[in-house]
Amino acid sequence: MAEKEVPLTAVKVEALVVMKIIKHCSQTFPTTATGSIVGMDAEGTLEITNSFPFPVVEMPAESHFDNTAPNPAAAAPRAKANTVYQAEMIRMLREVNVDANNVGWYTSANMGNFVNMNVIENQYFYQKEMNERTVALVHDVSRSAQGSLSLRAFRLSPKFMAAFKENKFTAEELQKSGLRYQDIFVELPVEIHNSHLITTFLHQLQCPRQSAPTDLPPSLAALESGPFVKDTILAPNYDNLSLSIDPFLEKNCDLLLDSIETHNTETNNFQYYQRSFTREQTKINQWIAKRKAENASRATLKQPPLPEDEWQRLFKLPQEPSRLESMLNSRQVEQYARQVDSFVSATTGKMFAVKGNLLPGETAK
């Protein structure tokens, strides 16, 4: 185990673990899938060597007035029953001589919608109760379906951990600490690792060569059904050539607009609080000024003064709402915007590649 002083700089995931996570998340999609990951910390690199899913446990409501729909799978990592289950699984893995150090948990996402209170509370629980050097692996199922694997590793920043522990997310506290929505997560680079035996096996696989040059296929379907693709397991993945832009981009834009609308709602609520606070503060100041004038007149008449702190019983200042939800929503807006930007930039190259076939009178150069 690496020393505590060495900061985590990267995450190395075994290919078998990646396949197990992909299988679990795909089978439960669109329901959230969560599980535990084990491995070891080697000189600042978190090596993940095994994983197992969490059973879904019903979480009790926090209060009788909590009418929100529960999400047992998303809250499973911090459930008490799953904590016992995880400890028992790690004990059994240790008995068969497998790396059995708790290094975090994984969760599935859809369109990058992982910035929420469940993920925050789960990761806070792991970094505070389990092991400070733990990560959350996020596998985006819908993004991976576009042809490229989406697997990211996150930790909560020390600044956010301190603020979440104190539960101080007022505007004044955020200004003092300098905490921004960009400071919620710390992302670590992810590297997928294969064993030397698997790498050697892949290099020894025979790849048939084409005996003679063939004509270019007229469509992607013809390319995928060609004899070269059917005869070898090392055929390239043609999902990256797909031009189905509308579904993914349209859904991302819808989610982005919803998040912006939520952000505007949070802003309006905070502005309403500020107006209410200013109105009540004005009433208090007027009452105090009136009481001071009354005490001054009573002093001239040699009468005892009236208490000037009686306003605390007569007036009640509104409580400032927490800015945590607004911060999470701002971080989610940034996530959706980055996804749209990355998807459009990747698709632009494809559009230029097929420009000659789309526009009459032009040929690809």
From Swiss-Prot:
A GO molecular-function annotation: metallopeptidase activity
Position of the signal peptide: none
Gene Ontology cellular-component annotations: eukaryotic 43S preinitiation complex; eukaryotic 48S preinitiation complex; eukaryotic translation initiation factor 3 complex
Family: Belongs to the eIF-3 subunit H family.
InterPro entries (alphabetical): eIF3h, eIF3h_C, JAMM/MPN+_dom, JAMM_MPN+_peptidase_M67A, MPN
Ranges of residues in domain MPN: 11-160
Superkingdom in the source lineage: Eukaryota
Species the sequence originates in: Aspergillus terreus (strain NIH 2624 / FGSC A1156)
The keyword Protein biosynthesis belongs to this UniProt entry's keyword annotation: yes
Keywords: Cytoplasm, Initiation factor, Protein biosynthesis
Subunit architecture: Component of the eukaryotic translation initiation factor 3 (eIF-3) complex.
Coiled coil, from the record: none
CDD domains: MPN_eIF3h (cd08065)
Location in or out of the cell: Cytoplasm
Name assigned to this protein: Eukaryotic translation initiation factor 3 subunit H
Function: Component of the eukaryotic translation initiation factor 3 (eIF-3) complex, which is involved in protein synthesis of a specialized repertoire of mRNAs and, together with other initiation factors, stimulates binding of mRNA and methionyl-tRNAi to the 40S ribosome. The eIF-3 complex specifically targets and initiates translation of a subset of mRNAs involved in cell proliferation.
Pfam families to which the protein is assigned, alphabetical: eIF3h_C (PF19445), JAB (PF01398)
GO BP field: formation of cytoplasmic translation initiation complex
